Amino acid sequence: MDSIGENILEKGLLLLGVELDQSQVKVLLAYLRLLEKWNQHYNLTAIKNSKEMISKHVLDSLSIESYLEGRRILDVGSGAGLPGIPLAIARPGCEFVLLDSNAKKTRFLFQASVELGLPNISVVSERVEVYRPSHLFDTIIARAFAKLVDFVAQAEHLCKPRGCLLAMKGRFPQDELEALPASFEIVKACSLSVPEINAQRHLVKLRPRRAGDH
């Protein structure tokens, strides 16, 4: 990752309003270099261009940083560590669990957490619907889950009673929102502006309804 890439990243962070110190920026760049290296052999992401990785992976991940709640965060289907690793770098005071059922991907996630020196990351190789942690989560994130109704059905047992689910989507998922069960309320469904990305990006924030909520 050259100085041009570093400039693109720093400019993007400024536009997103995400404040990181120089050491955090260096860890983000080290993550991208590691991802490029592993991607040559393990096909972790279809994006090969380093400049595209900055925008479509790192900046896209950090576009939801301000929506995180609490200290205990779960990244469902983390894959190559997106959005979990960039968010863990930005939020060192939070505890992140990166969950993926693909052993090849969890090997990369574990290696990345060690090489990047990220003690706030734990990696779990498990399917979300059978994952049973000892403690529930304040925020559960999914970046590439097929449908909202499936995300809710498979992850709701992991959410604290007043926690939230964050679903990162492309186009506005109107049909998916209408199909959601009454047990969850839609807190927010908004567009995201990600530097260097022209495609539509949206975020849906959901919360479990309490008894008596209407």
From Swiss-Prot:
EC number(s) given by UniProt: 2.1.1.170
GO CC annotation: cytosol
UniProt cross-references to InterPro entries, sorted A to Z: rRNA_ssu_MeTfrase_G (IPR003682), SAM-dependent_MTases_sf (IPR029063)
UniProt catalytic activity: guanosine(527) in 16S rRNA + S-adenosyl-L-methionine = N(7)-methylguanosine(527) in 16S rRNA + S-adenosyl-L-homocysteine
Subcellular localization: Cytoplasm
Stored SUPFAM superfamilies: S-adenosyl-L-methionine-dependent methyltransferases
Keywords, ordered alphabetically: Cytoplasm, Methyltransferase, rRNA processing, S-adenosyl-L-methionine, Transferase
One Pfam family it belongs to: GidB
Residue sites binding S-adenosyl-L-methionine per the record: G77, L82, V128, E129, R143
Keyword Zinc: no
Gene Ontology molecular functions: rRNA (guanine-N7-)-methyltransferase activity
Domain of life: Bacteria
Gene3D superfamilies hit by this protein: Vaccinia Virus protein VP39
PANTHER family: S-ADENOSYL-L-METHIONINE-DEPENDENT METHYLTRANSFERASES SUPERFAMILY PROTEIN
Family: Belongs to the methyltransferase superfamily. RNA methyltransferase RsmG family.
Task of the protein: Specifically methylates the N7 position of guanine in position 527 of 16S rRNA.
UniProt name for this protein: Ribosomal RNA small subunit methyltransferase G
Name of the coding gene: rsmG
